[in-house]
Amino acid sequence: MDMTVSNQKAESDDGSDIDDAALLQKINSLPIDQSITNSVSLEKHDFQGSDDHDSSTDLSDSTLEDVEGSEWADVSRGRYFGSDPSESIVCHNCKGNGHISKDCPHVLCTTCGAIDDHISVRCPWTKKCMNCGLLGHIAARCSEPRKRGPRVCRTCHTDTHTSSTCPLIWRYYVEKEHPVRIDVSEVRKFCYNCASDEHFGDDCTLPSRSNYPESTAFCEANCPSGNDASNKEFFETRRKEFQLERREQNRNQKSSKQRPFHKPGNSLASRLGSKPKSFKRKHSPPSEENGNLSFHSSDGRKFTKTSKKNRKRKW
C-alpha cells in the first residue's frame, strides 16, 4: 500500500516539472517589445546610481549660478515636475524670490516694518524728545524752546525723577480700545512681601526692600475695576507721603552738616572744669621798613629779613 502512494507522488512531481518547462517555452516563444526592455534597463541604471551618489540631496557646493536650466530640475526640490530656479530661493529680509538676504536691494526696518524708508537705528519710533515729549527727534534737535523749572516725568507725571529714569518704562501697558472691566472680587490678591492673600505687595504695611515711590501693577488702585477717580487719589497720597519723607531726609542731612565744630582743647577743658588758655601767636605779623621785613617774637626780639625785591643777584 505504501509503495503505491509513493509511486503516485513521484508521478505527480514529474508532471508538474513538465508543465513548468512547457510554460517557459511558450513565454520565450512570444515576441519581445523593445520599448519595455529599454524602460526596464533605464530604471535599473537609475537605481544603481542612487546607491553610489544622490545628486538631489547634495546641495552644499551647488549654487544658482553653477546649476541652471535642465540641471536644476534634477537637484531642486521639485525635480519630478520641474521648477523655476528663481522661485526656490527665498530672501529672509523682504520674503522675495530669486535672491538671498545678502543681495537684497530693499531696506527693511525691523521696528516699524517700513520698507525702503529708513533703517532700524534711525526709526522715529525709537527716538523720544525729553523737551516736548514727541517722537521722531531728540532734545538736542528740538525746535521748541527749552523748558526750565521743576523736573516732571512725562510718563507718570511725578516730580521725583525724569522721563529717562522713570521706573514705569519697563512695565508700560498699552490700553485696548474697548477695555473689559472685571469685578474686584474675582481678582486674586497676593502679597510678594509677606505672602498674604488679603492684599497686594504695594499695599503691604510691613517694611519692604522696594524703594520705588510709585505703585506697580501689584496694588489695589491698579485693579481692572479701579480705573476711576479713586486711582488718582491713591497716587496723590503716595506722592505726598514720598515728598514728606524726602523733606525729612534733607532736613536731617542739613542738620548734620551744620553741627558746631568743637576744638579738642575746649572739650578737654570742659571735662576738667577749667577754662582754656588764650592762644598767643609766636610771631607778630611782619611790617615792612626800608624794603625789609621785620618780625617780632613773643619775647620781644626782632628779626629782619630782606625782601625779594631788594635782593641783589649774584650774577
UniProtKB/Swiss-Prot annotation:
Listed GO MF terms: RNA binding; zinc ion binding
Biased composition (Basic residues): 303-315
Annotated signal sequence range: none
Oligomer status and interactors: Component of the TRAMP complex composed of at least cid14, mtr4, and air1.
Function recorded in the entry: Component of the TRAMP (TRF4) and TRAMP5 complexes which have a poly(A) RNA polymerase activity and are involved in a post-transcriptional quality control mechanism limiting inappropriate expression of genetic information. Polyadenylation is required for the degradative activity of the exosome on several of its nuclear RNA substrates like cryptic transcripts generated by RNA polymerase II and III, or hypomethylated pre-tRNAi-Met. Both complexes polyadenylate RNA processing and degradation intermediates of snRNAs, snoRNAs and mRNAs that accumulate in strains lacking a functional exosome.
Protein family: Belongs to the AIR1 family.
Zinc fingers (CCHC-type), renumbered ranges: 89-106, 127-144, 189-206
Repeat in keyword set: yes
GO biological process, one term: rRNA catabolic process
Listed Basic and acidic residues bias regions: 43-56
Subcellular location: Nucleus, Nucleolus
Database matches in SMART domains: ZnF_C2HC
Primary localisation category: nucleus
Region of interest called Disordered, as start-end residue ranges on this chain: 43-68, 244-315
Alphabetical UniProt keywords: Metal-binding, Nucleus, Phosphoprotein, Repeat, Zinc, Zinc-finger
Record keyword Transport present: no
Biased composition (Polar residues): 287-297
Modified residues (Phosphoserine): S12, S16
GO cellular component terms, A-Z: nucleolus; TRAMP complex
Record PANTHER family: ZINC FINGER CCHC DOMAIN-CONTAINING PROTEIN 7
InterPro entries: Air1/2_Saccharomycetales, TRAMP_AT-DNA-binding, Znf_CCHC, Znf_CCHC_sf
Disulfide pairings: none
Protein's name according to its UniProt entry: Protein air1
